[in-house]
């Protein structure tokens, strides 16, 4: 997550922040591979960052037509910059999860929602037949002490999810609440046993994720 560099320049107090991203080597390695791999009209695409990247989705879901398009350290602007090969393939479904790396760079919930909306509009305009599913950000657990840039960001995640859900409803996009299925209601952190670093999932976490999305994947 920390290996992706971001520089944000505020143009003025009444204008949105403009973000410029310098992507790491892994971003280009993986995105260049994705540009060579075909996406078909029957395919189901999972688009995201390291949390998506870390799963063998076709095996977990038992479906050969599921494509993993996750890149570790990626941000929402990165999704926008590399989504064209997905859109060109006119897939049946796209499941999106992203924003935690943006939060680590101190972007606001409003900024994240604006970027996510741009991504969704781009997909809808380029591939109207594609069904889009926006998944909530996952809870974190700062007790591991691994990601100092995420310290104190629990409520930013909650607020971003609120804005994401409202935006998804405006655009007729299906909202999938992963957060409530993984959060400890007492501590507000990710449930024990789902992560071993406070951010990325263990196998048990991916099973929770699978159970949440499977009805939509099979639909």
Regions found by a protein language model. Give the residues of each.
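N-terminal secretory targeting modules
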Residues: 1-45, 53, 57, 218
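Acidic/histidine-rich helix-loop elements
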Residues: 20-21, 62-76, 104, 198
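Conserved beta-strand scaffold positions in the cores of enzyme catalytic domains, especially
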Residues: 46, 66-68, 175
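Oxyanion-hole/transition-state-stabilizing segment in secreted/luminal serine hydrolases
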Residues: 47, 52-65, 77-114, 133, ...
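Charged helix-capping and loop-helix junction motifs
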Residues: 109-119, 157-160
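Surface-exposed amphipathic alpha-helices with a cationic face
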Residues: 120-124
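A short helix->loop->beta-strand "cap" motif at the edges of active sites that frequently abuts
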Residues: 127-131
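Catalytic His-Asp segment of secreted/periplasmic serine-dependent ester chemistry enzymes
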Residues: 139-219
């Amino acid at each position: 997550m920390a290996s992706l560099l971001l520089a944000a320049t505020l143009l003025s107090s009444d204008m949105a922040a403009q973000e410029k991203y310098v992507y790491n080597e892994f971003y280009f390695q993986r995105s260049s591979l994705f540009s060579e791999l075909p996406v078909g009209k029957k395919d189901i695409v999972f688009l995201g960052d390291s949390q998506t990247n870390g799963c063998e989705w076709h095996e977990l879901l038992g479906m050969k037509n599921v494509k993993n398009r996750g890149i570790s350290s990626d941000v929402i602007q990165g999704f926008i910059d590399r989504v064209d090969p997905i859109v060109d393939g006119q897939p049946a479904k796209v499941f999106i999860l992203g924003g935690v790396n943006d939060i680590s760079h101190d972007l606001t919930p409003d900024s994240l929602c604006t970027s996510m909306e741009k991504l969704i509009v781009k997909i809808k305009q380029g591939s109207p037949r594609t069904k889009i599913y926006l998944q909530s950000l996952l809870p974190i657990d700062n007790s591991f002490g691994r990601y100092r840039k995420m310290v104190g960001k629990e409520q930013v995640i909650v607020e971003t999810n609120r804005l994401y859900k409202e935006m998804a409803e405006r655009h007729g996009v299906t909202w999938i609440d992963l957060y409530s299925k993984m959060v400890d209601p007492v501590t507000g952190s990710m449930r024990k046993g789902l992560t071993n670093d406070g951010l990325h999932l263990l196998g048990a976490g991916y099973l929770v994720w699978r159970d949440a999305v499977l009805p939509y994947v099979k639909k």
